[in-house]
Amino acid sequence: MKPKTIIEKIWENHVVYREEGKPDLLYIDLHLVHEVTSPQAFEGLRQNGRKVRRPDLTFATMDHNVPTVNRFVITDEVARNQIAALERNCREFGIPLADLHSEEQGIVHVIGPELGLTQPGKTIVCGDSHTSTHGAFGALAFGIGTSEVEHVLATQTLWQHKPKTLQIRINGQLGKGVTAKDVILAIIGRYGVGVGTGYIIEFTGEAIRRMSMEERMTICNMSIEAGARAGLISPDETTFAYLRGRKYAPKGEEFDQAVERWRALASDEGAEYDKTIEIDASTIAPMVTWGTNPSMSTSVDGTVPDPEQFESETERNAVRRALEYMGLKPGMSITEIPVQHVFIGSCTNSRISDLREAAKIVKGQKVAPGVRALVVPGSQQVKKQAEEEGLAQIFLDAGFEWRDAGCSACLGMNPDIIPEGEHCASTSNRNFEGRQGKGARTHLVSPAMAAAAAIYGRFVDVRQLEAEPVR
């Protein structure tokens, strides 16, 4: 029997209908819903007299528009209407909802895993591009548009062309101070935002196997920034240990049986991929983006590039535009770039391990004068745990703002906006023009790098912090 990748196994297990030359009809095991991309989908059901086919395979929360201070006072009319619509729609169609009063509320891609809804072998969709986060568990997870949200609500299926397979193998061990965020930024920086276009990526190799589940989620979260349809990692003992005891995970003997099924999902020895990229983990350093897409990055000990060093006129023009928008000059050291804002949060880096890493840097320090620093936990459960562990107090003592759960400053869709022309060290996933607010200048970094930037008011190499004072 021909060896198969995990991608092939999950896909074949979910094909409901196939016709040559056309997309496959896939069954969907879990549909995650939030307030921004769902109102029109529910209205479409209502207009056509349809019900939600599987409310038991659907789970909703509110995250994008939610204020992270005074969360019950929503001043923006659009946000208020979207949140009210989600409450009404979930009531009417019988969908479970983690609303603002729920201790389970949070960013949809944080609560899915922590509640045990996300499991190996599942097909998972959500009206949000970073649904690929759930691929860390060996699930096939991808974002969909609003018309597709309606289709899944009505039928529990989705038409999809089968993408090609790309293996990205990270060999060896990461150096001190280098994180999962640096790995995915390095991949995109070296190979571009189009490297995964037309592919589903499977991340493999020793460095991946050594990562915790939360680190793996960071990697898979940003597969989309590499252009991929989805990204995933074959499940292993780390996966199973994380899921054991979670609210919606199987229990007792059923869990043991599930583990046997999940174990069989891993890509077979000798399975063929359409393309493979190999990277030596030891060559990766802490990363910082300097431009306006995630591939415009360099190591923290690097410099802002000169547009003239790029081969094509298209690239040169893109770099010139990016530098003008970001207010940077060619040849500037990354450590010279001043930072006025720091955001530790988002579906990329707002889990408990992210907050622990940031708190290690912050403990006993103070936020630099002129810097505003936010820590926004990814869920109310993460918030509670961080408070119990004393992390929240570490941040507060240093001068950080400690918030409720939500998408917050990742996107300019709620009150947490970065002012025009100011630089933000952000643990989020996108640095496009205007992403964090009109004219905001976003630099993508790891939680440790963001924490260090808050303390020093500029980027510093976290690898040096223990060895010698940087100020």
Swiss-Prot record:
On the tree of life, the source organism's domain of life is: Bacteria
Q: Which Pfam families match?
A: Aconitase
Q: How is the cofactor bound?
A: Binds 1 [4Fe-4S] cluster per subunit.
The pathway that the record names for this protein is:
Amino-acid biosynthesis; L-leucine biosynthesis; L-leucine from 3-methyl-2-oxobutanoate: step 2/4
Alphabetized SUPFAM superfamilies for the sequence: Aconitase iron-sulfur domain
Q: State its role.
A: Catalyzes the isomerization between 2-isopropylmalate and 3-isopropylmalate, via the formation of 2-isopropylmaleate.
Q: How does it assemble?
A: Heterodimer of LeuC and LeuD.
State the protein's name: 3-isopropylmalate dehydratase large subunit
**Where does this protein come from, organism-wise?**
Geobacillus thermodenitrificans (strain NG80-2)
